[in-house]
């Protein structure tokens, strides 16, 4: 692990990166990309948490929704997959659930808005095979083609 979360103070996140350089420039660049992606994941995880609730009951259309507690979910970001514990709500009647974080952060399927935008742009230039390859080669992001196709439909 090369990216370490040092502090979260108000709107500021401080991280520390330790990157081992190589005698090969290409290898060094790959190591730098991986470290920056790791840092991006850590900071994006903190950014996503800011859109969550404190777990208090909420009213939607006059109906009371209560938190089922914090449940983990993986989100796709430009930097990698991030796991976030977030509150999921349900009415006393059961049925469908609601996640305020996903509404307020404008999550698309399970992608952050920036990642969804990147994927949409890449689809404008080619099919899912090319998008999958481009993300892996140019961004260090390995994403299943089936996920990309599902994201494209949204």
Predicted regions and their residues:
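Short, positively charged, Gly/Tyr-enriched micro-motifs
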Residues: 82-154
């Amino acid at each position: 692990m090369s990216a370490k979360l040092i502090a979260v103070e108000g709107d500021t996140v401080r991280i520390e990166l330790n990157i081992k350089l190589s005698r090969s420039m290409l290898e060094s660049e790959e190591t730098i990309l991986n470290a920056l992606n790791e840092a991006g994941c850590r900071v994006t995880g903190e950014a996503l948490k800011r859109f969550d609730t404190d777990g208090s009951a909420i009213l939607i259309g006059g109906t009371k929704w209560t938190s089922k507690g914090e449940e983990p979910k993986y989100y796709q970001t430009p930097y990698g997959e991030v796991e976030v514990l977030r509150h999921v709500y349900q009415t006393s009647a059961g049925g469908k659930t609601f996640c305020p974080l996903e509404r307020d952060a404008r999550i698309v399927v399970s992608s952050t808005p920036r990642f969804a935008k990147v994927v949409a742009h890449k689809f404008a230039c080619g099919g899912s095979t090319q998008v999958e390859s481009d993300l892996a080669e140019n961004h260090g992001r390995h994403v299943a083609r089936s996920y990309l196709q599902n994201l494209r439909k949204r």
